[in-house]
From Swiss-Prot:
It comes from the Bacteria. Residues 193-388 form the GMPS ATP-PPase domain. One of its GO terms (cellular component) is cytosol. Keywords: ATP-binding, Glutamine amidotransferase, GMP biosynthesis, Ligase, Nucleotide-binding, Purine biosynthesis. ATP binds at S220, G221, G222, V223, D224, S225, S226. Pathway: Purine metabolism; GMP biosynthesis; GMP from XMP (L-Gln route): step 1/1. The active site is at C80 (nucleophile), H166, E168. Its EC number is 6.3.5.2. Catalyzes the synthesis of GMP from XMP. GO terms for molecular function: ATP binding; GMP synthase activity. The gene is guaA. This is GMP synthase [glutamine-hydrolyzing]. It catalyses: XMP + L-glutamine + ATP + H2O = GMP + L-glutamate + AMP + diphosphate + 2 H(+).
Length: 513
Protein backbone atom coordinates (compact mmCIF):
# COMPACT_ATOMS: atom_id res chain seq x y z
CA UNK A 1 0.00 0.00 0.00
CA UNK A 2 1.26 3.49 -0.85
CA UNK A 3 1.91 5.57 2.24
CA UNK A 4 2.41 9.18 3.29
CA UNK A 5 5.32 8.89 5.73
CA UNK A 6 5.38 11.48 8.52
CA UNK A 7 8.77 11.89 10.21
CA UNK A 8 8.44 12.94 13.84
CA UNK A 9 10.64 15.81 15.06
CA UNK A 10 8.96 16.03 18.46
CA UNK A 11 5.93 18.29 18.04
CA UNK A 12 2.96 17.73 20.33
CA UNK A 13 0.81 17.91 17.17
CA UNK A 14 2.62 15.23 15.15
CA UNK A 15 -0.04 12.54 15.55
CA UNK A 16 -2.60 14.99 14.21
CA UNK A 17 -0.78 15.14 10.85
CA UNK A 18 -1.27 11.40 10.39
CA UNK A 19 -4.91 11.65 11.45
CA UNK A 20 -5.71 14.55 9.11
CA UNK A 21 -4.17 12.75 6.12
CA UNK A 22 -6.10 9.56 6.92
CA UNK A 23 -9.34 11.49 7.41
CA UNK A 24 -9.00 12.61 3.78
CA UNK A 25 -8.72 8.99 2.63
CA UNK A 26 -4.94 8.52 2.28
CA UNK A 27 -2.92 6.03 4.31
CA UNK A 28 -0.23 7.60 6.51
CA UNK A 29 2.22 6.30 9.09
CA UNK A 30 4.50 7.95 11.63
CA UNK A 31 8.19 7.17 12.06
CA UNK A 32 10.93 8.87 14.13
CA UNK A 33 12.92 11.47 12.18
CA UNK A 34 16.03 9.29 12.33
CA UNK A 35 14.32 6.13 11.04
CA UNK A 36 16.52 3.98 8.83
CA UNK A 37 16.09 4.27 5.07
CA UNK A 38 14.90 0.64 4.88
CA UNK A 39 12.10 1.36 7.40
CA UNK A 40 10.81 4.21 5.25
CA UNK A 41 11.14 2.34 1.95
CA UNK A 42 9.30 -0.66 3.40
CA UNK A 43 6.19 1.54 3.65
CA UNK A 44 6.25 2.32 -0.10
CA UNK A 45 6.28 6.11 0.49
CA UNK A 46 4.62 8.41 -2.00
CA UNK A 47 5.28 11.60 0.01
CA UNK A 48 7.22 12.66 3.11
CA UNK A 49 6.01 15.15 5.73
CA UNK A 50 8.50 16.51 8.26
CA UNK A 51 6.73 17.47 11.49
CA UNK A 52 7.31 20.41 13.77
CA UNK A 53 9.39 20.14 16.92
CA UNK A 54 10.87 22.06 19.87
CA UNK A 55 14.49 22.14 18.63
CA UNK A 56 16.54 24.86 16.96
CA UNK A 57 18.54 23.88 13.87
CA UNK A 58 21.66 25.39 15.46
CA UNK A 59 21.50 23.36 18.66
CA UNK A 60 24.09 20.68 19.24
CA UNK A 61 22.63 17.31 18.16
CA UNK A 62 19.61 19.06 16.59
CA UNK A 63 17.46 16.74 14.44
CA UNK A 64 18.15 17.10 10.72
CA UNK A 65 16.77 15.97 7.36
CA UNK A 66 18.28 12.56 6.54
CA UNK A 67 20.13 12.54 3.22
CA UNK A 68 18.15 9.60 1.84
CA UNK A 69 14.89 11.57 2.17
CA UNK A 70 16.10 13.92 -0.57
CA UNK A 71 17.12 11.01 -2.79
CA UNK A 72 13.73 9.25 -2.68
CA UNK A 73 12.56 11.67 -5.41
CA UNK A 74 9.12 12.10 -3.87
CA UNK A 75 7.44 15.33 -2.67
CA UNK A 76 8.43 16.65 0.76
CA UNK A 77 6.47 19.00 3.03
CA UNK A 78 8.20 20.54 6.06
CA UNK A 79 5.98 21.89 8.85
CA UNK A 80 7.37 24.51 11.28
CA UNK A 81 10.68 22.94 12.43
CA UNK A 82 10.44 20.70 9.36
CA UNK A 83 10.51 23.84 7.19
CA UNK A 84 13.50 25.24 9.11
CA UNK A 85 15.38 21.94 8.85
CA UNK A 86 14.86 21.93 5.06
CA UNK A 87 16.03 25.54 4.71
CA UNK A 88 19.10 24.81 6.83
CA UNK A 89 19.84 21.66 4.82
CA UNK A 90 19.77 23.52 1.51
CA UNK A 91 21.96 26.41 2.69
CA UNK A 92 19.40 29.03 3.68
CA UNK A 93 19.47 30.96 6.95
CA UNK A 94 17.36 30.38 10.07
CA UNK A 95 17.64 32.78 13.02
CA UNK A 96 16.05 33.50 16.36
CA UNK A 97 13.10 35.78 15.78
CA UNK A 98 13.04 39.04 17.74
CA UNK A 99 9.33 38.44 18.23
CA UNK A 100 8.16 34.92 19.00
CA UNK A 101 5.07 34.08 16.94
CA UNK A 102 2.55 32.00 18.86
CA UNK A 103 -1.17 31.79 18.13
CA UNK A 104 -3.28 33.12 15.28
CA UNK A 105 -1.75 34.90 12.30
CA UNK A 106 -3.13 36.02 8.93
CA UNK A 107 -1.47 34.17 6.05
CA UNK A 108 -1.42 35.79 2.60
CA UNK A 109 -0.74 33.25 -0.15
CA UNK A 110 0.33 33.18 -3.79
CA UNK A 111 -1.34 31.04 -6.42
CA UNK A 112 0.04 27.52 -5.99
CA UNK A 113 -1.21 23.90 -6.07
CA UNK A 114 -0.71 23.76 -2.28
CA UNK A 115 -3.35 26.48 -1.80
CA UNK A 116 -5.67 25.52 -4.65
CA UNK A 117 -9.30 26.30 -3.84
CA UNK A 118 -8.41 28.56 -0.89
CA UNK A 119 -8.92 32.31 -0.40
CA UNK A 120 -6.02 34.74 -0.74
CA UNK A 121 -5.93 35.37 3.03
CA UNK A 122 -6.90 33.13 5.94
CA UNK A 123 -6.13 32.38 9.60
CA UNK A 124 -3.30 30.01 10.52
CA UNK A 125 -1.82 28.80 13.82
CA UNK A 126 1.82 29.68 14.48
CA UNK A 127 4.07 28.28 17.20
CA UNK A 128 7.75 29.12 16.72
CA UNK A 129 10.62 31.24 18.04
CA UNK A 130 13.10 30.71 15.17
CA UNK A 131 12.23 31.87 11.67
CA UNK A 132 13.64 31.73 8.16
CA UNK A 133 15.63 34.88 7.27
CA UNK A 134 17.05 33.84 3.91
CA UNK A 135 15.83 31.24 1.43
CA UNK A 136 18.15 28.69 -0.15
CA UNK A 137 18.88 29.11 -3.83
CA UNK A 138 16.06 27.81 -6.02
CA UNK A 139 13.30 28.37 -3.42
CA UNK A 140 10.42 30.86 -3.65
CA UNK A 141 7.96 32.47 -1.24
CA UNK A 142 4.33 31.37 -1.68
CA UNK A 143 2.94 32.64 1.64
CA UNK A 144 3.73 35.31 4.24
CA UNK A 145 2.41 36.63 7.55
CA UNK A 146 3.13 39.85 9.43
CA UNK A 147 6.02 38.32 11.39
CA UNK A 148 7.03 35.57 8.95
CA UNK A 149 8.07 36.82 5.51
CA UNK A 150 8.76 33.19 4.50
CA UNK A 151 5.68 31.53 6.05
CA UNK A 152 5.25 29.18 3.06
CA UNK A 153 7.89 28.25 0.48
CA UNK A 154 8.57 25.81 -2.34
CA UNK A 155 11.39 24.92 -4.70
CA UNK A 156 11.17 25.67 -8.43
CA UNK A 157 10.29 22.05 -9.28
CA UNK A 158 7.23 22.11 -6.97
CA UNK A 159 8.47 19.00 -5.16
CA UNK A 160 9.75 20.43 -1.87
CA UNK A 161 7.43 22.60 0.23
CA UNK A 162 7.61 24.16 3.67
CA UNK A 163 5.13 26.00 5.90
CA UNK A 164 5.93 27.84 9.13
CA UNK A 165 2.39 27.31 10.51
CA UNK A 166 0.58 24.13 11.63
CA UNK A 167 -1.98 22.94 9.04
CA UNK A 168 -2.77 19.88 11.18
CA UNK A 169 -4.44 21.81 14.04
CA UNK A 170 -8.08 22.89 13.92
CA UNK A 171 -7.05 26.51 14.67
CA UNK A 172 -5.68 26.76 11.10
CA UNK A 173 -8.41 27.51 8.57
CA UNK A 174 -8.36 25.09 5.62
CA UNK A 175 -5.49 23.16 7.25
CA UNK A 176 -6.88 19.76 6.23
CA UNK A 177 -7.39 21.06 2.69
CA UNK A 178 -3.73 22.16 2.51
CA UNK A 179 -2.58 18.68 3.55
CA UNK A 180 -5.00 17.13 1.06
CA UNK A 181 -3.70 19.38 -1.73
CA UNK A 182 -0.13 18.35 -0.93
CA UNK A 183 -0.98 14.64 -1.01
CA UNK A 184 -3.40 14.62 -3.96
CA UNK A 185 -2.21 17.45 -6.24
CA UNK A 186 1.52 17.57 -5.55
CA UNK A 187 2.24 13.92 -4.64
CA UNK A 188 -0.49 12.71 -7.08
CA UNK A 189 -1.57 10.02 -4.61
CA UNK A 190 -4.91 8.27 -5.07
CA UNK A 191 -7.22 7.61 -2.11
CA UNK A 192 -6.50 4.25 -0.52
CA UNK A 193 -7.80 4.35 3.06
CA UNK A 194 -11.40 3.45 3.94
CA UNK A 195 -12.54 1.81 7.15
CA UNK A 196 -14.86 -0.69 5.49
CA UNK A 197 -11.99 -1.95 3.33
CA UNK A 198 -9.84 -2.22 6.44
CA UNK A 199 -12.49 -4.32 8.19
CA UNK A 200 -12.88 -6.87 5.38
CA UNK A 201 -9.09 -7.10 4.88
CA UNK A 202 -8.46 -7.46 8.63
CA UNK A 203 -11.05 -10.25 9.00
CA UNK A 204 -9.45 -12.09 6.08
CA UNK A 205 -5.97 -11.55 7.58
CA UNK A 206 -7.03 -12.87 11.02
CA UNK A 207 -8.58 -15.98 9.44
CA UNK A 208 -5.34 -16.63 7.56
CA UNK A 209 -3.16 -16.20 10.66
CA UNK A 210 -5.28 -18.02 13.25
CA UNK A 211 -6.77 -20.85 11.18
CA UNK A 212 -8.58 -23.28 13.51
CA UNK A 213 -6.75 -22.23 16.67
CA UNK A 214 -8.29 -20.24 19.51
CA UNK A 215 -7.59 -16.64 20.57
CA UNK A 216 -7.85 -15.38 24.15
CA UNK A 217 -8.80 -11.73 24.75
CA UNK A 218 -8.88 -9.61 27.89
CA UNK A 219 -12.24 -7.85 27.55
CA UNK A 220 -13.03 -4.65 29.45
CA UNK A 221 -16.28 -3.66 27.76
CA UNK A 222 -14.67 -0.46 26.46
CA UNK A 223 -14.78 0.46 22.79
CA UNK A 224 -11.26 -0.81 21.94
CA UNK A 225 -11.57 -4.33 23.35
CA UNK A 226 -15.21 -4.56 22.17
CA UNK A 227 -14.21 -3.78 18.58
CA UNK A 228 -11.35 -6.30 18.80
CA UNK A 229 -13.84 -8.89 20.09
CA UNK A 230 -16.26 -8.24 17.21
CA UNK A 231 -13.50 -8.35 14.58
CA UNK A 232 -12.21 -11.64 15.95
CA UNK A 233 -15.71 -13.09 16.30
CA UNK A 234 -16.45 -12.25 12.65
CA UNK A 235 -13.19 -13.95 11.66
CA UNK A 236 -13.06 -17.04 13.89
CA UNK A 237 -16.48 -17.32 15.56
CA UNK A 238 -16.52 -19.39 18.75
CA UNK A 239 -12.75 -19.87 18.64
CA UNK A 240 -12.61 -16.51 20.42
CA UNK A 241 -12.18 -16.88 24.20
CA UNK A 242 -12.98 -13.47 25.81
CA UNK A 243 -12.09 -13.10 29.50
CA UNK A 244 -13.69 -10.36 31.60
CA UNK A 245 -11.97 -9.73 34.94
CA UNK A 246 -14.36 -8.13 37.45
CA UNK A 247 -12.01 -6.14 39.66
CA UNK A 248 -14.77 -4.71 41.84
CA UNK A 249 -13.57 -1.28 40.70
CA UNK A 250 -16.11 -0.95 37.89
CA UNK A 251 -19.12 1.31 37.54
CA UNK A 252 -22.46 0.25 39.03
CA UNK A 253 -23.81 -2.94 37.36
CA UNK A 254 -21.05 -2.76 34.73
CA UNK A 255 -20.06 -6.42 34.93
CA UNK A 256 -23.62 -7.58 34.28
CA UNK A 257 -24.04 -5.06 31.44
CA UNK A 258 -20.88 -6.23 29.66
CA UNK A 259 -21.98 -9.86 29.90
CA UNK A 260 -25.50 -9.09 28.62
CA UNK A 261 -24.23 -6.88 25.77
CA UNK A 262 -21.95 -9.59 24.41
CA UNK A 263 -24.49 -12.36 24.87
CA UNK A 264 -26.88 -10.31 22.70
CA UNK A 265 -24.10 -10.16 20.08
CA UNK A 266 -23.72 -13.95 20.23
CA UNK A 267 -20.38 -13.87 22.09
CA UNK A 268 -19.98 -15.95 25.26
CA UNK A 269 -17.57 -14.38 27.74
CA UNK A 270 -15.73 -15.92 30.68
CA UNK A 271 -16.22 -13.80 33.82
CA UNK A 272 -13.63 -13.91 36.62
CA UNK A 273 -14.80 -12.56 39.98
CA UNK A 274 -11.62 -11.07 41.49
CA UNK A 275 -13.22 -8.31 43.61
CA UNK A 276 -11.85 -9.48 46.97
CA UNK A 277 -8.37 -10.06 45.58
CA UNK A 278 -8.09 -6.49 44.23
CA UNK A 279 -9.57 -4.92 47.36
CA UNK A 280 -7.19 -6.87 49.62
CA UNK A 281 -4.21 -5.83 47.47
CA UNK A 282 -5.23 -2.16 47.75
CA UNK A 283 -5.78 -2.18 51.52
CA UNK A 284 -4.44 1.04 53.12
CA UNK A 285 -2.77 2.20 49.86
CA UNK A 286 -3.18 5.95 49.21
CA UNK A 287 -0.52 6.86 46.65
CA UNK A 288 -2.03 6.95 43.12
CA UNK A 289 1.10 5.58 41.42
CA UNK A 290 1.20 2.69 43.90
CA UNK A 291 -2.49 1.99 43.24
CA UNK A 292 -1.89 1.81 39.50
CA UNK A 293 1.06 -0.53 39.90
CA UNK A 294 -0.77 -2.85 42.30
CA UNK A 295 -3.82 -3.02 40.03
CA UNK A 296 -1.64 -3.65 36.98
CA UNK A 297 0.31 -6.45 38.67
CA UNK A 298 -2.82 -8.02 40.17
CA UNK A 299 -4.59 -7.94 36.82
CA UNK A 300 -1.63 -9.64 35.15
CA UNK A 301 -1.58 -12.35 37.83
CA UNK A 302 -5.34 -12.98 37.59
CA UNK A 303 -5.33 -13.00 33.79
CA UNK A 304 -2.30 -15.30 33.71
CA UNK A 305 -3.89 -17.83 36.09
CA UNK A 306 -7.18 -17.74 34.17
CA UNK A 307 -5.40 -18.14 30.84
CA UNK A 308 -3.52 -21.19 32.09
CA UNK A 309 -6.78 -22.77 33.30
CA UNK A 310 -8.48 -22.10 29.94
CA UNK A 311 -5.44 -23.38 28.05
CA UNK A 312 -5.70 -26.62 30.02
CA UNK A 313 -9.43 -26.80 29.29
CA UNK A 314 -9.36 -25.98 25.55
CA UNK A 315 -5.84 -27.03 24.59
CA UNK A 316 -5.49 -25.09 21.34
CA UNK A 317 -5.34 -21.46 22.52
CA UNK A 318 -2.39 -20.16 20.51
CA UNK A 319 -2.95 -16.39 20.40
CA UNK A 320 -3.50 -13.46 22.77
CA UNK A 321 -5.40 -10.49 21.27
CA UNK A 322 -4.84 -6.97 22.58
CA UNK A 323 -6.62 -3.67 21.89
CA UNK A 324 -3.39 -1.72 21.31
CA UNK A 325 -3.97 1.49 19.31
CA UNK A 326 -1.57 3.53 17.16
CA UNK A 327 -1.05 6.23 19.84
CA UNK A 328 0.08 3.44 22.23
CA UNK A 329 2.70 2.35 19.70
CA UNK A 330 3.83 5.94 19.14
CA UNK A 331 3.94 6.75 22.87
CA UNK A 332 5.95 3.63 23.65
CA UNK A 333 8.57 4.84 21.16
CA UNK A 334 8.42 8.42 22.43
CA UNK A 335 8.86 7.25 26.04
CA UNK A 336 12.29 5.96 25.11
CA UNK A 337 13.44 9.55 24.48
CA UNK A 338 15.26 11.26 27.29
CA UNK A 339 13.02 14.32 27.04
CA UNK A 340 9.79 12.37 27.59
CA UNK A 341 8.36 13.16 31.02
CA UNK A 342 6.18 10.50 32.63
CA UNK A 343 3.00 12.03 34.04
CA UNK A 344 1.25 8.81 35.06
CA UNK A 345 1.95 5.11 34.76
CA UNK A 346 -0.37 3.76 32.07
CA UNK A 347 -2.42 0.77 33.13
CA UNK A 348 -2.10 -1.90 30.48
CA UNK A 349 -1.32 -5.58 30.08
CA UNK A 350 2.18 -4.97 28.80
CA UNK A 351 3.60 -7.57 31.19
CA UNK A 352 1.45 -10.34 29.77
CA UNK A 353 3.25 -11.26 26.52
CA UNK A 354 6.45 -12.24 28.36
CA UNK A 355 4.61 -14.51 30.79
CA UNK A 356 2.09 -16.21 28.50
CA UNK A 357 2.83 -18.91 25.91
CA UNK A 358 0.79 -17.13 23.23
CA UNK A 359 1.57 -15.23 20.05
CA UNK A 360 0.27 -11.66 20.04
CA UNK A 361 -2.45 -10.33 17.72
CA UNK A 362 -3.10 -6.55 17.71
CA UNK A 363 -5.75 -5.91 15.03
CA UNK A 364 -6.05 -2.17 15.84
CA UNK A 365 -2.36 -1.31 16.30
CA UNK A 366 -2.29 1.17 13.39
CA UNK A 367 -5.61 2.89 14.18
CA UNK A 368 -6.61 6.02 16.10
CA UNK A 369 -9.56 6.06 18.50
CA UNK A 370 -11.92 7.80 16.06
CA UNK A 371 -11.10 5.15 13.44
CA UNK A 372 -11.87 2.41 15.97
CA UNK A 373 -15.30 3.95 16.58
CA UNK A 374 -15.95 3.94 12.82
CA UNK A 375 -15.09 0.23 12.72
CA UNK A 376 -17.52 -0.32 15.60
CA UNK A 377 -20.27 1.26 13.48
CA UNK A 378 -19.36 -0.89 10.45
CA UNK A 379 -19.48 -4.01 12.67
CA UNK A 380 -22.88 -2.81 13.97
CA UNK A 381 -21.91 -2.58 17.61
CA UNK A 382 -24.62 -0.83 19.69
CA UNK A 383 -24.16 2.95 19.87
CA UNK A 384 -24.09 2.70 23.67
CA UNK A 385 -20.86 0.70 23.36
CA UNK A 386 -19.31 2.78 20.57
CA UNK A 387 -19.94 6.14 22.25
CA UNK A 388 -19.11 5.01 25.78
CA UNK A 389 -17.01 7.56 27.65
CA UNK A 390 -13.36 6.64 28.32
CA UNK A 391 -12.81 4.75 31.57
CA UNK A 392 -9.39 4.37 33.23
CA UNK A 393 -7.82 0.91 33.35
CA UNK A 394 -7.45 1.03 37.17
CA UNK A 395 -11.17 1.85 37.35
CA UNK A 396 -12.69 3.65 40.32
CA UNK A 397 -9.48 3.21 42.35
CA UNK A 398 -8.09 6.37 40.71
CA UNK A 399 -11.39 8.20 41.23
CA UNK A 400 -11.27 7.50 44.95
CA UNK A 401 -8.71 9.91 46.34
CA UNK A 402 -6.92 8.18 49.18
CA UNK A 403 -7.69 4.69 50.51
CA UNK A 404 -9.92 2.39 48.47
CA UNK A 405 -12.60 0.86 50.70
CA UNK A 406 -15.85 -1.02 50.06
CA UNK A 407 -17.79 1.94 51.43
CA UNK A 408 -16.01 4.44 49.15
CA UNK A 409 -16.55 2.20 46.10
CA UNK A 410 -20.27 1.82 46.88
CA UNK A 411 -20.80 5.57 47.42
CA UNK A 412 -18.88 6.49 44.27
CA UNK A 413 -20.68 3.90 42.12
CA UNK A 414 -24.08 5.29 43.12
CA UNK A 415 -23.08 8.96 42.72
CA UNK A 416 -21.47 8.30 39.33
CA UNK A 417 -24.55 6.35 38.18
CA UNK A 418 -26.84 9.27 39.00
CA UNK A 419 -24.58 11.76 37.17
CA UNK A 420 -24.40 9.62 34.01
CA UNK A 421 -28.11 8.76 34.14
CA UNK A 422 -29.05 12.45 34.28
CA UNK A 423 -26.64 13.31 31.44
CA UNK A 424 -28.36 10.70 29.26
CA UNK A 425 -31.87 11.79 30.30
CA UNK A 426 -31.06 15.39 29.37
CA UNK A 427 -29.35 14.50 26.04
CA UNK A 428 -26.01 15.77 27.35
CA UNK A 429 -24.06 12.49 27.50
CA UNK A 430 -23.01 12.56 23.84
CA UNK A 431 -22.21 16.28 24.04
CA UNK A 432 -19.39 15.82 26.55
CA UNK A 433 -16.24 13.80 25.89
CA UNK A 434 -16.02 12.33 29.38
CA UNK A 435 -17.96 12.68 32.63
CA UNK A 436 -17.59 11.04 36.02
CA UNK A 437 -17.76 11.46 39.78
CA UNK A 438 -14.80 11.54 42.19
CA UNK A 439 -14.81 10.49 45.87
CA UNK A 440 -12.81 13.05 47.88
CA UNK A 441 -10.80 12.17 51.01
CA UNK A 442 -12.50 14.82 53.13
CA UNK A 443 -15.71 15.23 55.08
CA UNK A 444 -17.75 18.38 55.41
CA UNK A 445 -20.28 19.73 57.88
CA UNK A 446 -23.87 19.90 56.71
CA UNK A 447 -27.44 20.18 57.99
CA UNK A 448 -30.21 17.70 57.20
CA UNK A 449 -33.51 18.53 58.85
CA UNK A 450 -32.68 19.57 62.40
CA UNK A 451 -29.49 17.57 62.54
CA UNK A 452 -25.83 18.38 61.93
CA UNK A 453 -24.11 16.01 59.52
CA UNK A 454 -20.44 15.31 58.90
CA UNK A 455 -20.23 13.33 55.68
CA UNK A 456 -18.38 12.71 52.41
CA UNK A 457 -17.84 15.07 49.48
CA UNK A 458 -18.31 14.10 45.81
CA UNK A 459 -16.74 16.07 42.94
CA UNK A 460 -18.30 15.97 39.48
CA UNK A 461 -16.05 16.25 36.42
CA UNK A 462 -17.12 16.72 32.79
CA UNK A 463 -14.85 17.77 29.93
CA UNK A 464 -14.99 18.46 26.21
CA UNK A 465 -12.10 17.23 24.11
CA UNK A 466 -11.22 15.93 20.66
CA UNK A 467 -8.65 13.33 21.64
CA UNK A 468 -7.93 13.69 25.36
CA UNK A 469 -4.60 15.46 24.79
CA UNK A 470 -6.16 18.77 25.84
CA UNK A 471 -9.60 19.34 27.36
CA UNK A 472 -11.91 22.16 28.44
CA UNK A 473 -14.29 21.79 31.37
CA UNK A 474 -17.89 21.40 30.19
CA UNK A 475 -20.20 24.35 30.80
CA UNK A 476 -23.16 22.22 31.92
CA UNK A 477 -26.37 24.14 32.77
CA UNK A 478 -26.62 25.24 36.40
CA UNK A 479 -30.14 23.82 36.70
CA UNK A 480 -28.83 20.45 35.55
CA UNK A 481 -25.94 20.46 38.05
CA UNK A 482 -28.34 21.51 40.81
CA UNK A 483 -30.60 18.54 40.03
CA UNK A 484 -27.68 16.07 39.98
CA UNK A 485 -26.33 17.42 43.30
CA UNK A 486 -29.75 17.17 44.97
CA UNK A 487 -30.26 13.61 43.76
CA UNK A 488 -26.82 12.49 44.96
CA UNK A 489 -27.29 14.04 48.42
CA UNK A 490 -30.83 12.65 48.79
CA UNK A 491 -30.22 9.19 47.32
CA UNK A 492 -26.64 8.32 48.26
CA UNK A 493 -26.23 7.69 51.97
CA UNK A 494 -23.05 9.24 53.35
CA UNK A 495 -22.79 12.30 51.05
CA UNK A 496 -23.74 15.84 52.10
CA UNK A 497 -21.82 17.99 49.61
CA UNK A 498 -21.28 17.98 45.81
CA UNK A 499 -18.78 20.22 43.97
CA UNK A 500 -18.08 20.73 40.25
CA UNK A 501 -14.53 20.72 38.83
CA UNK A 502 -13.96 23.67 36.44
CA UNK A 503 -10.28 23.02 35.64
CA UNK A 504 -9.11 22.47 32.06
CA UNK A 505 -6.27 20.26 30.79
CA UNK A 506 -3.63 21.65 31.05
CA UNK A 507 -2.94 22.55 33.84
CA UNK A 508 -4.91 19.62 35.31
CA UNK A 509 -5.18 16.11 33.92
CA UNK A 510 -8.68 14.83 33.14
CA UNK A 511 -8.61 12.19 35.88
CA UNK A 512 -7.83 13.33 39.41
CA UNK A 513 -5.22 10.60 39.93
Amino acid sequence: MKTVVVLDYGSQYTQLIVRRVREKGYYAELLPWDAKEEEVKRLNPTAIILSGGPSSVYEKDAPFVPEYVLHLNIPILGICYGLQALVHKFGGRVEKSQKREFGHAILEVEEDPLFEGLPKKFDVWMSHSDRVEKLPEGFYVIGRSENSPFAAIRNKNETIYGVQFHPEVTHTQFGSKILENFVSKIAKMEKNWEMKDFVSEKIKEIKGIVGNDKVILGLSGGVDSSVVAMLLHKAIGDNLVPVFVDTGLLRLNEGEEVKENFERLGIKIFVVDAKKRFLDALKDVEDPEEKRKIIGHTFIDVFYETSMQLLEEFGNIKYLAQGTLYPDIIESKVSERKSAAKIKTHHNVGGLPEKLPFKIIEPLRYLFKDEVRKIGEILELPQSMINRHPFPGPGLAVRIIGKVTEEAISILQKADYIFIEELKKNNLYDKVWQAFAVFLPIKSVGVMGDYRTYENVIALRAVNSFDGMTADWSKLPHEFLNKVAKRIINEVKGVNRVVYDITSKPPATIEWE
